[in-house]
A protein has these predicted regions:
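Extended ligand-binding regions for polar small-molecule ligands
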Residues: 46-55, 116-119, 123-124, 129, ...
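Extracytoplasmic small-molecule ligand-binding "clamshell" domains
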Residues: 19-86, 94
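A conserved helix-loop-strand patch within extracytoplasmic ligand-binding domains
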Residues: 58, 87, 100-148
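Beta->alpha turn/N-cap motifs
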Residues: 25-30, 63-68, 77-89, 115, ...
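Hydrophobic h-region of N-terminal signal peptides that target proteins for export
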Residues: 9-17
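Periplasmic-binding protein-like
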Residues: 28, 104-113, 178-220, 238-250
Length: 250
């Protein structure tokens, strides 16, 4: 009888582990990090989180919402984690905790203007209106540059206003700016705001220190793996060599 009970407990334990779910929030409007393709969520963050979840035994359940709603949803326990190309800024760290960074290559941020604009570099934009996504790190860059940030729910809205000359410029992560420059007419890049290794991390509730540690340890485990390298090459091919160089340094 004891043997049967032990076997049943093992089966139930295995089933429980196999079906544990993690509800993860993202904003699928930030190519190549996360975006919709044929009504399916794809991107670097999406595949990376699925890989991390697999390593830890989680089934990832995705929740798509506006960028500025992500951290409030996390705090209200509507989701368990956030991955959305989000930087772990000091201001955000007051409200939530973060994993270690999961991006291991240097980046930057494009300064984009209307193609009829006479602006030639970011310094020309002091006192000018610059479109940024609500809650994004680009808002800080705009302020640091002496510009007046105008907040948008997403970069598509900001760039449409730029096309129509309703704002003077948009600041956007270069990997995403590159995608918009390919497909949108009437805009051009004039400058880049350089960034060191971005502090791009996964957000968790303050109380979920164990969960944050689990994911941090797993990021360290997979960063040297062929799977991670393939994701970098797939979504950030222009940064692949830089990624390899940084791995050798570490």
């Amino acid at each position: 009888m004891k043997k049967i009970i032990t076997i049943l407990m093992l089966i139930l334990s295995t089933l429980s582990f196999a079906t544990k779910k993690l509800y993860v929030g993202t904003n699928a409007e930030f190519k190549p990090y996360e975006y919709l393709e044929n009504n399916k969520m794809v991107g670097f963050d999406i595949e990376l989180m699925e890989l991390l979840g697999k390593e830890l035994g989680y089934e990832i359940k995705w929740q798509d919402m506006s960028f500025d709603a992500l951290l409030p949803a996390l705090q209200m326990k509507k989701i368990d984690a956030v991955i959305a190309g989000m930087s772990a800024t000091p201001e955000r760290e007051k409200a939530v905790s973060f994993s270690i960074p999961y991006i291991f290559f240097e980046g930057g941020h494009d300064v984009i203007v209307n193609d009829k604009s006479s602006f030639k570099k970011k310094e020309y934009l002091k006192g000018k209106t610059v479109g940024v996504q609500l809650g994004s790190i680009q808002e800080e860059f705009a302020k640091d540059n002496g510009s007046i940030p105008k907040l948008y729910n997403n970069f598509t809205e900001a760039l449409l206003d730029l096309q129509n000359q309703k704002i003077d410029a948009v600041i956007i992560a270069e990997v995403s700016g590159k995608e918009y420059l390919k497909t949108m007419k009437g805009i051009k890049k004039i400058d880049t705001i350089k960034d060191k290794l971005p502090n791009t991390s996964i957000a968790f509730r303050k109380a979920d220190t164990k969960l944050a540690k689990e994911f941090s340890n797993t990021i360290l485990k997979i960063k040297n793996s062929p799977e991670y390298a393939k994701l970098v090459k797939k979504y950030f091919p222009e940064h692949y060599d830089n990624f390899i160089t940084n791995l050798k340094k570490n």
